Structure formats: C-alpha cells, structure tokens
Amino acid sequence: VATRNMAMSRQKKLDKMEVIELAKEKPKPEFCFKEARAAGKVIFETDDLVIGYNKKPLSKPINLRMERGEKIAVTGTNGIGKTTFLKSVLGLIPAVSGKAVLGDYLYKGYFEQEIKPGNNTCIEEIWETFPSYTQYEVRSALAKCGLTTEHIESKVRVLSGGEQAKVRLCKLINVETNILLLDEPTNHLDIDAKDELKRALKEYKGAVLIVCHEPDFYEDLVDKVWNLEEYSLLA
C-alpha cells in the first residue's frame, strides 16, 4: 500500500510539472556558391531595351551595362517591371523593342521569384538536377541549406515558402556560375537564412543582379542600384 501511495504521489507531482518540449531540429543554413571560370568583361548591355508583355511597353528605352564581378540591385515599386527586366535580359521573354546583348563565357544561375512546385519530394527535386549525386550527397546538400530530415523527405509543395526557397537555393549553389540573377530571393526566408545568403553573396566572386525590396539586405552588398522607376511609363 505504501509503495502504491508513493507511486500515486509521484504521479501527481509529474502531472503538475509543465511539459518541456525538446527543441525541434532546426539546422542553420550554410550557403556557398560554386564558381565557374571568369566571364568576359561585359556581362550584358541593353540597347534601347523596352520591356513589356504582349507588345505592350512597360518602360522607356533602357540603356544599361553590367560588367564582370559587379553586384547590382534592381529596385522599384511593385508592377514596375523588375521581373520582366530580368527575363528580358535573359531572353526568356521578347523585348517590345531594342535588345539585350549577353557577353561571353557566361555561366548563369537564375532564381525565379515564384515557381509552382510539382509532385516531387525534395530528394527527387535535387536528384533530377544532379542525377550523379548519391542519396547521401543529396541529403547533405539539402541539410546544408537548413532543411530538416522531415522537410527533406516531404513533397516540395507541402513545404512553407521559406523551405521551398531553400530547396531552390540548394539547386542554385550546387551549379557552377559566374553570374547570378536573383528575383526577390529573400521574400520568404527567415532571418538566419537571409544573413547567410548575404554573407555567401558577399563572398561570391561572380556578378550578381538582384531584384530586392529590402534596402537592409542589399545596401552593403551591391556596388550600385538600378531604380526602374526612372524608366517607367507609369511614373
């Protein structure tokens, strides 16, 4: 009876104790961009480039030039044409008029603002891009980008915006590049991931063209700022 009373007394004490949750696995990201050989002197140059969709212009003629190793932020209000400018430079959409001329020996890395994820798990997503990787290498690459085991084994579409961005950054950092074109890469990232991305971009020797609406992120990262409002037909 005494033993039973002691056990009940201990159980009451346990019931009163607050439940302490173990800290959830939260790996810190480590981004390190792989670098290709040096690009030619000129990365790209625009010649009276007018951007827009379906032949409807969004801008006045744009004449800009980017050189090897430069880091430039593209800014402006929403809807001004920042994404359109990036896609026009890359040749992914046609210019309304004028042109963008790309330089020599470019190894491009492009981070799109939004991509609709398919049905792949994170592992499958990376394996499709890097089929020669072992499963261990795929898992390690994803973990380095700050994803947990649970994330890594999940389908990309069920992840949060920040976690999906880390999967896409995982693809980007493991390809050799000498020019990065980044469209709002900080949009969904947590503070640790933002800080680490900024550190990695500062260390990167190639050119960086980044669309960003966060001055705190780009101000001490870039050499110059291109404000597309200066070229806007809406201004």
Predicted regions mapped to residue ranges:
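Active-site phosphate-binding and catalytic loops of NTP-dependent enzymes
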Residues: L22-K26
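Short intracellular "coupling" helices and adjacent cytoplasmic loop segments at the cytosolic face
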Residues: V1-N5, E21
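Alpha-helix N-cap/helix-initiation sites
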Residues: R4-A7, Q135
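ABC ATP-binding cassette signature C-motif
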Residues: P27, F33-A235
